[in-house]
Amino acid sequence: MAAKDVQFGNEVRQKMVNGVNILANAVRVTLGPKGRNVVVDRAFGGPHITKDGVTVAKEIELKDKFENMGAQMVKEVASKTNDVAGDGTTTATVLAQSIVAEGMKYVTAGMNPTDLKRGIDKAVAALVEELKNIAKPCDTSKEIAQVGSISANSDEQVGAIIAEAMEKVGKEGVITVEDGKSLENELDVVEGMQFDRGYLSPYFINDAEKQIAGLDNPFVLLFDKKISNIRDLLPVLEQVAKASRPLLIIAEDVEGEALATLVVNNIRGVLKTVAVKAPGFGDRRKAMLQDIAILTGGVVISEEVGLSLEKATLDDLGQAKRIEIGKENTTVIDGFGDAAQIEARVAEIRQQIETATSDYDKEKLQERVAKLAGGVAVIKVGAATEVEMKEKKDRVEDALHATRAAVEEGVVAGGGVALLRARAALENLHTGNADQDAGVQIVLRAVESPLRQIVANAGGEPSVVVNKVLEGKGNYGYNAGSGEYGDMIGMGVLDPAKVTRSALQHAASIAGLMLTTDCMIAEIPEEKPAVPDMGGMGGMGGMM
């Protein structure tokens, strides 16, 4: 085991803060409508230009082990916020840097770090509650477009295309982002259902470029058990072969001889088939198979209801216009199911959502509604160069996450104003402990930092703007994009409440851990001995 470098106290904390500052200073320049670009060198291809905080954070690795630990902890803030809300990574980083900087002053002055952390936690809990109170629902297409635009660095075209996608596939539908072929952004909407299971063998692929198996006008066989014996399948395969159409088999599993025979038939061109595992587990799998059956107009072949694989006919099989099977996902497009039956099924699942007790069950049921009722929308990002395409795609993905978050928990005034207004909840928050009260003060000051940074990036004077915004009430704030003061929601500067909440909670969580750190341990790199020079080889003195 390699030797370790163990360091204690203020000295090591300062190194950690240095790491935090290096990473945060690189990320914070991207904040706001006038945020600057960061150019990242890549080992392959051209440099990557981005305004996405988490992309910048992920690229940073520092030489000093202790500074690097600080940087990695703040990177965690950005990543966690990105995972939960899909946006707000830069805001979270700016908040974390501010809480750490303020907190370190108090720790160095001799205050109890644990009490400071408790104070910070109490302040954040009060702010989160206040944010919930001031959030307003985000229902209209116009509001969705505004949220999308703000998240895509004030690109109105991106906001509009996301709002259109949500309108077409429903707020619960599947929306994906892909590289486009033209200079303009395009929206492609496909009515269909997507589930997270891919082909069981790469030999099923028939589109090498996209790495998918595409089936046009296929039959769909749904079976709730494993298929390992090809004899069980033969009667159905013969009927499908006579109809000269491809077949998708969705079963608990397809293995052994059955899978091998399907692959061989596919390679030889005898019968175009693809096998995938059924999505979900246990009772949820049965329910999802039933969903697919209703969508495609087929029947789930199950021994529980007296149906067997050997006696299955073409009438038992579902059908669709097209099915695309990738490595991890299968998309059923234009199933032949009866619209009335699909609606009845959706209504039935919505009923289950109302009676479900656990959040997990509700989430899974919600997903099933999305897959049945919605469709699949593909936003194709257009750009002149590959470098611009990557940058634009980052922003579109951010905007998509932000709009989903807005629909979920509502919106608040953007541009850092919501956090300033939520401060009102801290004015009268007294913990009865001087050190904890100091923790509350840390958060009170830190919530100004996002607005200060937005103004600084726009070339304004942060203190002047913050004071003027604090003099106002409600949604009154500063629009850095246009340089005007006014009603932020009226001007279309909105942030999803979920993004602001997640940024604050994750920033405070990691910053609190940093303040209570008193020892850091890093590995001492082993010094590799230099390779000695090769001495003159004997007996070769006469050679020039």
UniProtKB/Swiss-Prot annotation:
Superkingdom of this protein's organism:
Bacteria
Q: What is one term from the GO cellular component aspect held by the record?
A: cytoplasm
GO biological process annotation, one example: protein refolding
Q: Where does ATP bind?
A: 30-33, 51, 87-91, 415, 495
Enzyme Commission code: 5.6.1.7
Q: Which cysteines are joined by disulfide bonds?
A: none
Keywords associated with the record: ATP-binding, Chaperone, Cytoplasm, Isomerase, Nucleotide-binding
Q: What InterPro entries does the annotation carry?
A: Chaperonin_Cpn60_CS, Cpn60/GroEL, Cpn60/GroEL/TCP-1, GroEL-like_apical_dom_sf, GROEL-like_equatorial_sf, TCP-1-like_intermed_sf
List membrane-spanning regions.
none
Q: Which reaction does it catalyse?
A: ATP + H2O + a folded polypeptide = ADP + phosphate + an unfolded polypeptide
The entry lists its GO molecular-function terms as: ATP binding; ATP-dependent protein folding chaperone; isomerase activity; unfolded protein binding
CDD domains membership:
GroEL (cd03344)
Q: Main EC class of this protein?
A: isomerase
Protein localization: Cytoplasm
The cross-references to PROSITE patterns, in alphabetical order and at most eight, read: CHAPERONINS_CPN60
User: Which Pfam family, any one of them, does this sequence belong to?
Assistant: Cpn60_TCP1
Q: Which family does it belong to?
A: Belongs to the chaperonin (HSP60) family.
Q: What role does this protein play? A: Together with its co-chaperonin GroES, plays an essential role in assisting protein folding. The GroEL-GroES system forms a nano-cage that allows encapsulation of the non-native substrate proteins and provides a physical environment optimized to promote and accelerate protein folding.
Per UniProt, subunit arrangement is: Forms a cylinder of 14 subunits composed of two heptameric rings stacked back-to-back. Interacts with the co-chaperonin GroES.
Q: This chain belongs to which protein, by name?
A: Chaperonin GroEL
Q: Which organism is it from?
A: Neisseria gonorrhoeae (strain NCCP11945)
This protein's encoding gene: groEL
